Amino acid sequence: MQVTVETLEGLERRLNITVPAANIEDAVTAELRNIAKNRRFDGFRKGKVPMKMVAKMYGKAVRQDILGEVMQRHFIEAIIKEKINPAGAPTFAPVENKEGSDLVFNATFEVYPEVELKGLENITVEKPAVEVKDADVEEMIETLRKQQATWTEVEEAAEAGKRVSIDFVGSIDGEEFEGGKAENFPLEMGAGRMIPGFEDGIEGKTKGMEFEIDVTFPEDYHAENLKGKAAKFAIKVNKVEARQLPELNDEFVAKFGVAEGGIDALKAEVRKNMERELKQAVKNRIKEQAIDGLVKENEIDVPAALIDQEINVLRQQAAQRFGGNVEAAMQLPRELFEEQAKRRVVVGLLLGEVIKAHELKVDEEKVKAIITEMATAYEDPTEVVTYYEQNEQMMNNMRNVALEEQAIDAIIAKAQVSEKEVSFNELMNQPA
């Protein structure tokens, strides 16, 4: 076998491979003999059919199969010999494959980029310095009360904190538009669900009032046909309601699975959950900054084949989120996923290089700690831990998580790390 390597554009490579004719002919002959020996032919005893007849009937098909197998096998031998690491499946193209002549073919493919980590010391990470305070717990309790609240109709004007039921019809230049009409629409005043100016126009109005308001859709509104458009809404207030918060008593506490200890026990449980969420949020914020810095300091070429694979993964995930229609999801335009897919590939390649450069191995104690921490969010943590320990696939997933965390720790160890005091709400409400 003769092999030459061509470097094409970017990460693309081409192997030109020559396989001696004897190798092909020997393989074809062996397969034809196998057919002659094991298949039945009318008029002949098994294994007694003439080879010329077998070759005439099956020779062309067998040769095609053998050529495919030979190209695949010799491609693998060639990349091992040349120490090449393909990033995707090759495209084979026969150049010369006449019977009796050497097989000459090429294989075109992409390789993984050569990554030499740099700039880890330039990465800046601002670690949130934050704790759950009593006021945060009280605010969360109030949020729980609001979630359990009931609404009672009142003869009062609409204002922040009240809820109104309205009919409305929207129009632009005198023409109604799609999605601009509703009846008995519940709107909590002050929640900021509607476009700017909509709630302001309702404030102060009472049951039975009919009126019109003028608003302008934001330039970044999700509906393309409404961006920046001036609109008029005809509105009728059907009723105004006030929120009735539940009392902080044993009945309220019981709704959250706290059987004993009253409101103090609920507060303790709420604090524990908030501290667990806070710990994860701090970890995520640090990880996000470390990865952002890693990507910024290390620009690399990305194999298109890996991006295509990741796009398909994202499409399948989209299908799972939206009803499981994989076929429909696979038809979604690649542009929807391309940027995210490329980012994920880049991050994966760079973290892989961090793991390699620092010779990181999975820390099984860290794996156990991650599972134990995660299990605390469930009613029976011991059962969750046991479930993971008995499921090898789940354990392997957790090992990957642990190894990624070890890679992040290695980045942080070389980065410029500072602390910044923030409140619980500031951290938890930061945009992703």
UniProtKB/Swiss-Prot annotation:
Location of this chain's protein in the cell: Cytoplasm
UniProt-listed PANTHER family: TRIGGER FACTOR CHAPERONE AND PEPTIDYL-PROLYL CIS/TRANS ISOMERASE, TRIGGER FACTOR-LIKE PROTEIN TIG, CHLOROPLASTIC
E.C. number: 5.2.1.8
Pfam families, per database record: FKBP_C, Trigger_C, Trigger_N
InterPro entries in the record: PPIase_dom_sf (IPR046357), PPIase_FKBP_dom (IPR001179), Trig_fac (IPR005215), Trigger_fac_C (IPR008880), Trigger_fac_C_sf (IPR037041), Trigger_fac_ribosome-bd_bac (IPR008881), Trigger_fac_ribosome-bd_sf (IPR036611), Trigger_fact/SurA_dom_sf (IPR027304)
Gene Ontology BP terms: 'de novo' cotranslational protein folding; cell division; chaperone-mediated protein folding; protein transport; protein unfolding
Gene name as annotated: tig
Signal peptide boundaries: none
Annotated NCBIfam families: tig
Matches recorded under PROSITE patterns: FKBP_PPIASE
Domain notes: Consists of 3 domains; the N-terminus binds the ribosome, the middle domain has PPIase activity, while the C-terminus has intrinsic chaperone activity on its own.
Entry similarity comment: Belongs to the FKBP-type PPIase family. Tig subfamily.
GO MF annotation, one: protein folding chaperone
Principal EC category: isomerase
Catalytic activity: [protein]-peptidylproline (omega=180) = [protein]-peptidylproline (omega=0)
Biological role stated in the UniProt entry: Involved in protein export. Acts as a chaperone by maintaining the newly synthesized protein in an open conformation. Functions as a peptidyl-prolyl cis-trans isomerase.
GO cellular component annotations of the record: cytoplasm
Top-level lineage group: Bacteria
Name of protein: Trigger factor
Start and end residues of each PPIase FKBP-type domain: 161-246
Keyword Cell membrane: no
Swiss-Prot/TrEMBL keywords: Cell cycle, Cell division, Chaperone, Cytoplasm, Isomerase, Rotamase
Record organism: Vibrio vulnificus (strain YJ016)
